[in-house]
C-alpha cells in the first residue's frame, strides 16, 4: 500500500514547555506541507506523533504514558502508527525504542527537516533507523562567534526558514515562518535562541539541546509579524537562557535591540521575555524592559536556590543578598512589576541551614509566582555523581514545606495588588471573562477574572482595577466601570 492509499491524517501531541510548543508548530507546518492533514481527535489519525519532554522524571513518565495511550488506538481500525519525537526521543533514542516497542519510530531533531517523508515511509510499511543520541554540544564550534556560519549544517528545532513550504502553510508574500499555529489564543511563544552553554550540575538539557545559538533579529521580527497576521497580540520570547541572546552574534546587548525592534511591529501589543539568568541580568536590560512601550514589566528569573554555597555546588552564581538587590532594583523603578522563579530543594549537600536561607529569601522576595521542585538525579549530570545525597523522604518533606510557604506568600502578593490598577489581556469568554495581567505569564502564573466587562472580545487589552484575589488569581473590573 502506498501513501496515496492512506488517509494521511496525523494527530500531534505537544508536551512540556513553550519551547517544545514552538517545535510542534514547526513539525505541524512541515507535515502539512508534505501532504498530511492534521486532526484534533487522535482516534481519527492514522499516525499519532508525540513531541515528548525529557526534562525531569515526571515529565518523562508523562511522555511514556502518552505514547502508550496513543498505541492503544491501533486497534480502532484507523490508527496504524505512533511516532516519538522531541526531547525524550532525542535524549534516549535507541534506549527508548527498545523499552517501548509500542512506538513505531523514535526520531531525533535531525529528522525534523523531512518529517513528512519519515511518516510516509512508516505508512508504506518501511522501517526507519532509530535515532542514536549524541552530545549535541559537539555539533557547533566551541567559540560562540563561530556558530552562525556553522548553523546551516545543524538541525536546530525552531530555527527553520520557510522557502520550502507551500502557500497553504505560509504565503508567497508577506511574513513567512516555518510553523502552523496549533492554538487560537492571542498569545504565542516565539523562540529567540536554542541550547545553553552553562554547565549547571543538575541539568542535562545542553547535552540534547546543544550549544547556545541565537536567531538573527530580522528572522525573529519576521516571525513576529507572521504571528500577528495569524491573530497573535502577545509574543512570549522563549529560550533556554534569554539573557545570553546575541553572545554568538557578537553583541552581548542584542536582546535590548531585539526588544526595540519588536516594539515596532504593527499589531503586536505585548512582548514578554522568559528565563533570564540573574548572573547576566544587566542594568541596561532591566531599563529596556521597563522603558519599552510594548514590553511588559515581567521578570522570569532563574534563581534555583538562595544559599550561596549550595548555588556554587550547583555550578551557579549568586546568593540571597545579590538576588534581593536585583529584585529591589526592579521594584524601585516599577513597583507593580511581575517577578517569578523556580527553586530546587534536596540538591546533594543541601542542609537544614540552606533550606532556612531559602525560606527567608522567599519571605523577603515577595515573588508573584514561585515553583518548588524536588531534586532528582538526571543521567549524565555532574550532580548525579555528587556525594551528600539527601534522603528521598527528607526531600519530599522539604518540598512540601516550601511549597506551602510559597502558596501563602504568592497569595499575599496577589492581595497586595487589590486596589491597584493594571492592564489585562482577554483570553477567554465563556461563562466568565478570563484574562491575564501584565505580571502574569501564559498558563503558569495565574489569571484574572473580569467582572462587569460585557463589551470585550478575546485579545482586547482592558485597563482594570483589581478588586479581589483567590490564591495567585485576581478579580478585576474595568477601570471605567
UniProtKB/Swiss-Prot annotation:
Domain TRAM as annotated: residue spans: 415-480
SUPFAM superfamilies hit by this protein: Radical SAM enzymes (SSF102114)
Positions with a binding annotation for [4Fe-4S] cluster 1: 17, 53, 87
The keyword Protein biosynthesis is assigned to this record: no
DNA-binding found in the keyword field: no
GO molecular function: 4 iron, 4 sulfur cluster binding; aspartic acid methylthiotransferase activity; metal ion binding; protein methylthiotransferase activity
Transmembrane segments: none
Keyword list, A-Z: 4Fe-4S, Cytoplasm, Iron, Iron-sulfur, Metal-binding, S-adenosyl-L-methionine, Transferase
Entry cofactors: [4Fe-4S] cluster
One annotated Gene Ontology cellular component of this protein: cytosol
Pfam families: Radical_SAM, TRAM_2, UPF0004
Binding site for [4Fe-4S] cluster 2: 196, 200, 203
Residue span, MTTase N-terminal domain: 8-124
Role played: Catalyzes the methylthiolation of an aspartic acid residue of ribosomal protein uS12.
Protein name: Ribosomal protein uS12 methylthiotransferase RimO
Taxonomic lineage of the native organism: Bacteria, Bacillati, Actinomycetota, Actinomycetes, Propionibacteriales
Gene that encodes the chain: rimO
Amino acid at each position: 500500500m502506498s501513501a496515496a492509499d492512506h488517509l494521511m491524517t496525523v494527530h500531534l501531541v505537544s508536551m512540556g514547555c513553550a519551547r517544545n510548543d514552538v517545535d510542534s508548530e514547526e513539525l505541524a507546518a512541515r507535515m502539512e506541507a508534505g501532504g498530511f492533514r492534521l486532526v484534533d481527535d487522535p482516534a481519527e489519525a492514522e499516525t499519532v506523533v508525540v513531541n515528548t519532554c525529557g526534562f525531569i522524571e515526571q515529565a518523562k513518565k508523562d511522555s511514556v504514558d502518552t505514547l502508550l495511550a496513543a498505541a492503544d488506538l491501533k486497534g480502532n481500525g484507523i490508527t496504524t502508527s505512533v511516532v516519538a519525537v522531541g526531547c525524550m526521543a532525542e535524549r534516549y533514542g535507541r534506549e527508548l525504542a527498545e523499552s517501548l516497542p509500542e512506538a513505531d519510530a523514535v526520531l531525533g531533531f535531525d529528522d525534523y527537516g523531512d518529517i513528512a517523508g519519515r511518516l510516509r515511509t512508516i505508512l508504506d510499511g518501511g522501517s526507519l533507523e532509530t535515532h542514536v543520541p549524541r552530545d549535541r554540544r559537539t555539533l557547533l564550534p566551541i567559540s560562540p562567534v563561530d556558530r552562525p556560519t556553522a548553523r546551516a549544517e545543524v538541525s536546530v528545532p525552531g530555527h527553520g526558514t520557510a522557502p520550502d513550504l507551500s502557500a497553504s502553510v505560509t504565503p508567497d508574500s508577506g511574513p513567512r515562518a516555518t510553523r502552523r499555529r496549533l492554538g487560537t489564543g492571542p498569545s504565542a511563544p516565539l523562540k529567540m535562541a536554542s541550547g545553553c552553554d552553562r554547565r549547571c550540575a543538575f541539568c542535562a538539557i545542553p547535552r540534547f539541546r546543544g550549544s547556545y545559538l541565537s536567531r538573527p533579529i530580522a528572522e525573529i521580527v519576521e516571525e513576529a509579524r507572521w504571528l500577528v497576521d495569524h491573530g497573535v497580540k502577545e509574543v512570549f520570547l522563549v529560550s533556554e537562557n534569554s539573557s545570553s541572546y546575541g553572545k554568538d552574534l557578537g553583541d552581548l546587548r542584542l536582546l535590548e535591540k531585539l526588544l526595540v525592534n519588536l516594539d515596532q511591529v504593527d499589531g503586536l501589543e505585548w512582548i514578554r521575555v522568559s528565563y533570564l539568568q540573574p548572573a547576566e541580568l544587566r542594568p541596561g536590560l532591566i531599563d529596556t524592559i521597563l522603558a519599552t512601550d510594548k514590553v511588559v514589566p515581567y521578570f522570569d528569573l532563574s534563581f534555583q536556590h538562595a544559599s550561596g554555597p549550595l548555588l556554587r555546588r550547583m555550578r551557579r552564581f549568586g546568593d540571597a543578598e545579590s538576588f534581593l538587590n536585583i529584585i529591589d532594583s526592579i521594584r524601585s523603578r516599577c513597583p507593580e512589576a511581575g517577578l517569578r522563579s523556580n527553586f530546587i530543594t534536596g540538591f546533594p549537600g543541601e542542609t537544614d541551614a540552606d533550606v532556612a536561607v531559602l525560606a527567608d529569601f522567599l519571605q523577603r522576595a515577595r515573588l508573584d509566582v514561585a515553583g518548588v521542585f524536588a531534586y532528582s538525579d538526571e543521567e549524565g549530570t555532574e550532580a548525579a555523581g555528587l556525594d551528600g545525597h539527601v534522603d528521598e523522604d527528607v526531600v519530599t518533606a522539604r518540598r512540601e514545606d516550601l511549597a506551602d510557604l510559597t502558596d501563602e506568600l504568592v497569595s499575599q502578593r496577589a492581595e497586595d495588588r487589590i486596589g491597584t490598577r493594571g492592564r489585562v489581556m482577554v483570553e477567554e469568554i465563556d461563562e466568565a471573562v478570563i484574562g491575564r495581567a501584565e505580571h502574569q505569564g501564559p498558563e503558569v502564573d495565574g489569571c484574572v477574572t473580569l467582572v462587569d466587562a460585557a463589551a470585550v472580545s478575546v485579545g482586547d487589552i482592558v485597563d482594570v482595577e483589581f478588586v479581589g484575589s483567590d490564591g495567585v488569581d485576581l478579580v478585576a473590573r474595568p477601570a471605567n466601570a
